[in-house]
Amino acid sequence: MNNCATFSMPHSNATNHTTLSHPVCNNNANCFTRSELYAIWSETINTLKRTFKIKNVHAHMLEDDSGEIKDYIRANLSRFTVITGKCSKRKVCHHDKRIARTLHLEKNLVDEYACSVTHVYSAPKW
């Protein structure tokens, strides 16, 4: 069985979809991980670039100038799906509260990295 996740992203033409595959932990198909949100973020940027809506596409999720990307994700949340080995089509909109919380984190990149490293190693290791 394939342990990859595929993300279907909406385009201006509803019949076209872009997919992204990468390995993810599939122990709980109902859980929406931050890495899946980052993959949706990347695919959103690619979609915006293809439609020439390039304002602030360089922005990271935790930066202040990422509003256009966040707005696009919020507006199209009901159209996103995640496909994993355990779940053929998991709707992203069911995780709207988790996504909203993650998109509104009050951290910078250094704090986010320190938090991630501390979570894994119990103390920063850089």
From Swiss-Prot:
Instruction: Name the UniProt key words of this record, in alphabetical order.
Output: Transcription, Transcription regulation
Family, similarity comment: Belongs to the baculoviridae LEF-11 family.
Q: Which organism is it from?
A: Epiphyas postvittana nucleopolyhedrovirus (EppoMNPV)
Q: What does this protein do?
A: Involved in late/very late gene activation.
What InterPro entries does the database record attribute to this sequence? Baculo_LEF-11
- Name by which UniProt lists this protein: Late expression factor 11
Per the record, the GO terms for biological process are: regulation of DNA-templated transcription; viral life cycle
Superkingdom, natural source:
Viruses
Looking at the Swiss-Prot or TrEMBL record, what is one Pfam family this protein matches? Answer: Baculo_LEF-11
